[in-house]
Amino acid sequence: MKIIYIHGATASERSFAFIQQSIRSAEPIYLNYNKATTAEQNLIDMRKVLDTVQEPFAIIAHSLGGVYATYIQNEYQTTGVVSLATPFGGSELATWGSIFNPHYQLFKDISPSSSFIRNSKKIDIQCPWIQMVTTVGDVPWINGTNDGIVTRSSMMCRRDVEYMEIDRNHYEIVLSQRVVDIIKNIVYK
């Protein structure tokens, strides 16, 4: 089975090295994107890659990658999605960041009031989806319980996914053996 990996905003495909080495799917496909480009253009570019995939696949997505996954999961033969600390409700940190850099495209796209986030919440999830909610790493300048980057309420604002709490912070989750074991269980059912 093919596995599509979609990284988080400040990461790259290398952030999945531990997971990918542990799972060893036949052919990993990485959907990379440019945080300086609009989310809409990134989706166009991702679809060009996915249009070449001729068989069903699972998606593993970290953080912002999970928001992208909401847009593509129902357009292809997606067997399931595992998202790690995805900010379905947007990022309060991006709202703060936009005060200091109002022209940074990533902040515009991931802000809770952005059309990218608002529209993603209107999309029905049509495949099995598990969201790993990170529970460690709280920082005081983000309002509400958070993992150092994303608030718990943002990670848990959808009603059409299954939630599982993981005692890791936003970055450690991609290095967790427990997460790998859960992913294997889901991907190879």
Predicted regions and their residues:
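Serine-dependent carboxylesterase/thioesterase catalytic core
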Residues: 3-7, 14, 22-126
